């Protein structure tokens, strides 16, 4: 039976292109999402075999969306589609339970191979990132340690996207006081004291696009 696929990318033209590519290879696309939170909701409702998540999506980045997908639909395998090939991004994704890490610079067939591999419960890395991950495990590179918790990273992304504390509280389902507490704590951890600094940090971490 053909794997059932959920696509998540904030660019409609990208989703349309990916759908055409996958359907041409006999794969079934059962849903599309334009942001990370919609992707999580659809994964919980549709229970796809594979969720393909763009790393830099609005409201919730692909990495944190993958964690939520795993929580709501444990059988769903996740693939991150990204421009980031540095070892610390790959390691962080693997630690989050992502099954596939596909670089956007690779040929289209790379994504199709990734889908088939993760459906066999294997881990798939694009060739362009494989060397970085091998070097990191051999001790030739030191992965960047993410100082923030998953929730703090979500708050960082929303702050960088221009959301108010009240809007952040609503999106996360917490009180305004709790949202403000998360913001204060992440600023203290990062030693950043203004919103502009948080935006720059979020861009460097790939949570939002410049």
Q: What are the roles of these predicted feature ranges?
A:
Residues 41, 63-75:
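Short amphipathic alpha-helix used as the core "switch/output" element in two-component signaling
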Residues 26-34, 42, 192:
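Short hydrophobic/Thr-rich beta-strand motif most characteristic of the beta2 strand and flanking loop
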Residues 54, 82:
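Active-site residues of response regulator receiver
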Residues 88-154, 196, 207-209:
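Short, flexible helix-to-coil linker/hinge segments that flank and couple to helix-turn-helix
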Residues 46-52:
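Active-site beta3 strand of CheY-like receiver
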Residues 35-38, 59-64:
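Acidic catalytic/metal-coordinating carboxylates
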Residues 12-31:
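Two-component/phosphorelay signaling modules centered on CheY-like receiver
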Residues 164-197:
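Recognition helix of helix-turn-helix DNA-binding domains
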